[in-house]
From Swiss-Prot:
Family statement drawn from the similarity comment of this UniProt entry: Belongs to the tubulin family.
GO annotation, cellular component aspect: cytoplasm; microtubule
Keyword rRNA-binding: no
Keyword annotations of the record: Cytoplasm, Cytoskeleton, GTP-binding, Magnesium, Metal-binding, Microtubule, Nucleotide-binding
GO biological-process terms attached to the record: microtubule-based process
Organism this protein belongs to: Lupinus albus (White lupine)
Domain of life: Eukaryota
Subunit text: Dimer of alpha and beta chains. A typical microtubule is a hollow water-filled tube with an outer diameter of 25 nm and an inner diameter of 15 nM. Alpha-beta heterodimers associate head-to-tail to form protofilaments running lengthwise along the microtubule wall with the beta-tubulin subunit facing the microtubule plus end conferring a structural polarity. Microtubules usually have 13 protofilaments but different protofilament numbers can be found in some organisms and specialized cells.
Residues that bind Mg(2+): E69
The protein, known as: Tubulin beta-1 chain
Amino acid sequence: MREILHIQGGQCGNQIGAKFWEVVCAEHGIDSTGRYGGDNELQLERVNVYYNEASCGRFVPRAVLMDLEPGTMDSVRSGPYGQIFRPDNFVFGQSGAGNNWAKGHYTEGAELIDSVLDVVRKEAENCDCLQGFQVCHSLGGGTGSGMGTLLISKIREEYPDRMMLTFSVFPSPKVSDTVVEPYNATLSVHQLVENADECMVLDNEALYDICFRTLKLTTPSFGDLNHLISATMSGVTCCLRFPGQLNSDLRKLAVNLIPFPRLHFFMVGFAPLTSRGSQQYRALTVPELTQQMWDAKNMMCAADPRHGRYLTASAMFRGKMSTKEVDEQMINVQNKNSSYFVEWIPNNVKSTVCDIPPTGLKMASTFIGNSTSIQEMFRRVSEQFTAMFRRKAFLHWYTGEGMDEMEFTEAESNMNDLVSEYQQYQDATADEDGYEYEDEEEIGEEA
């Protein structure tokens, strides 16, 4: 079976990850002790993708949990599904990374990384045919960003032909936890551009807006935000876990979404948006789902797709529905909004249909888009980075851990290159004259 190994790192990653497992367990009918109590044989058909079946009939998540301090792990362990994980798969240090990327990547994290890799190896050997890894982390702190990217590069070295998918929470423009977020995020993006295959970009501010505007929650908690993220994660991976009429795996997803290797940062969205605890009474139709899913307000990162163009997009519908209707709706969206899609990639929207809806819903859909407007996120982080780096503010925390200023400069220019690549393809046209291409060749020579 095509297994996926899940890794969560740092406080944010562990909290999102714990929520994700609650959702996936519920969908597969697995209770908090790992026993199956579901009523549908489809729940078990591909349960091996995320679970290992132990000899006693219990299902154990293929998950590795890591952090540089024990706090978050303890709360995962004492949480609703804390007892389902393999105890050996909790790997943690005592010192913490103090929101410092260098501590996570070079000093504290580097000391712990081997024990994490041992667990990863053990889990990978347990797989029949591992298709890839998914990593949950944030880019603003120290552990998820620094140690997370260190682990990704080590895994890349050891398993070069396996897919690497990340769910990365970017620092938000208005909601900031720490002042050095732009440093940590830029250094992380520098790594993710090179070592990850697909990055789902999330961001707390966009999630706050969804909770506030759409779900009408006056004071959204992290629990509410994580509820949205886990719904999306479950949607992104549903066609890997359940049989469906049009299925995909991590590699097919990448092939359909990534026209150029560096441009692998995706926006995600989910429909119908429901808050925790509320159930929807009215079943949505496929056209309504499609409309809500493409809505800019539904995107879980602070970039507006209307400011750019879609290179590619992929939609995953869940529930009993006709594939014909899904295809018609998707074509309809493309025809109505043709200016928002690049014309030099024909048929750039793919859809998959999976028969099993999420718990409590009749139908749902998840959206993954590769839009050039994601450059807004990178631009914003880059501006904040430059403002501080120009004055060398807070730099001693990083150089004190053995980092060099050169690394900051490289990360900054890599991020700026990424932004200009997105811009270049946003402006590109499908002219037949060939003039376009000559220009691009010149650009290539200069670089």
